[in-house]
Amino acid sequence: MQPPAFYVTGTDTGIGKTMGSTALLHALRARGHTAVGMKPVASGCERTPQGWRNEDALALQAASNPQPAYATLNPYALPAPLAPELAAADVGVTLSLEPITQAFAQLRAQAEVVVVEGVGGWAAPLSATLDQADLVRALQLPVVLVVGVRLGCINHARLTAAAIAADGLQCIGWIANEVDPQMERVEENIGMLRQRLAMPCWGRIPWRPDAEAAAQAQGLQLPR
């Protein structure tokens, strides 16, 4: 059964969590659902007349229907492109769960499904006292893992899946996102991932860097 919200994490930073998240939003919308994205913490923002804005969070906003207010979608917009703990310290901000849980509740009231995108890889902390696992527990979310398909991805995927399970949380699916156009034997690597990951594969996003998120969504097969 389709969960009303889930948390998207990745095998590392830069492996396409946002691509996976926006594709999920479009796939959900194609099924007739209202679906909105959320980026609780984003580091690496640009100053605009409307305030600090993050490229990934804006992509989630554009892929959402209805489109939520930016401050609700991205409660913590941190200027420096650093680990959240460092980026928050640079501007004297202490990250806490309450603003995130309040924003999440607002998004849940606006749409049938909320796609929450995490930061970096699973073990990347949010603050000195807050891990992503703490946030996922607070929001009571299952996890979807985006696997960046490149050399080393089998090790990274298995380690990430094991870490999620060790935190007592449920990973309900994974997405293969091709990030290296030079990688050899992609099909075999994805086949090995299918054999070794306990959760089902929700589809594959091919290497098409200029493709729109709606087109990338065509490679996904979400559970009913």
Swiss-Prot record:
The keyword Protein transport does not apply. The active site is at residue 39. Its cofactor is Mg(2+). GO terms for molecular function: ATP binding; dethiobiotin synthase activity; magnesium ion binding. CDD domains: DTBS. Substrate binds at residue 43. GO terms for cellular component: cytosol. Pathway: Cofactor biosynthesis; biotin biosynthesis; biotin from 7,8-diaminononanoate: step 1/2. Gene3D superfamilies: P-loop containing nucleotide triphosphate hydrolases (3.40.50.300). Keywords: ATP-binding, Biotin biosynthesis, Cytoplasm, Ligase, Magnesium, Metal-binding, Nucleotide-binding. It is an enzyme of class 6 (ligase). Its EC number is 6.3.3.3. ATP binds at residues 56, 117-120, 177-178. It is found in: Cytoplasm. Homodimer. Catalyzes a mechanistically unusual reaction, the ATP-dependent insertion of CO2 between the N7 and N8 nitrogen atoms of 7,8-diaminopelargonic acid (DAPA, also called 7,8-diammoniononanoate) to form a ureido ring. This is ATP-dependent dethiobiotin synthetase BioD.
